[in-house]
Amino acid sequence: MSEKIVVCLEKGGARDMAEAFSRRTNTTISEKPGEHLTVLFNSKGVSLTGYGLAYQGDFENMLHRVTNGRLQHEMLVRASKSEKPGRKAIDATAGMGEDGFLLAAQGYEVTLYEQNPVIAVLLKDALRRAKKHPILKEIAARMKLTEGNSVELMPALLDPVDVIYLDPMFPARQKSSLINKKLQLIQKLEPPCSQETDLFDAAISAKPDRK
């Protein structure tokens, strides 16, 4: 991570998740948020706060993209369309899991790779809450998070996959734009991707049907 973070556990927060994250990142748990980046565990889940911004993963925001016939209009869904039963996909640069969610909504069993521990714990919490949602739970059940570097993990895959999706984070061009506020916050802790070639080579080595 490119910036030091504070781990804050408030009343009602998931202590087991906070303690596991604290061990993973070699940080101590505080009762108060930090001045800059804070991973906050409270009764609402896990969020990233700092610099006057706050972000929490929430797949409910994706509902309008997968209901009322809208899913089939998504470019990713059209590109990965398949009638094969038991199809599997990898989202090698999961981020907050939006693209993996679209693949899972299409029926794929999706493995999400995320190497940044902060983004991974935000995604883990978002999936945990989605699995309790009456509509989202069926989609979320097809999504599995693996924390680690996909460049290192994909060449060791034993089971064949049908789709490998790559969407590395690139520098934001309009850092003052409201649409990039989430990206601004995340880029405080993870710089833009610098492994594009390695990522593509690792995906090729896994021999998917599509990539």
Where are these regions (language model features)?
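Helix-to-beta-strand junctions that scaffold the AdoMet/dcAdoMet cofactor pocket
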Residues: 207-209
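S-adenosyl-L-methionine
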Residues: 1-89, 105, 113-163
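Conserved beta-strand segments of alpha/beta enzyme cores
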Residues: 28, 109, 142-144
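Hydrophobic alpha-helical segments and helix pairs
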Residues: 77-119
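Mobile active-site "lid"/loop adjacent to the S-adenosyl-L-methionine
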Residues: 168-201
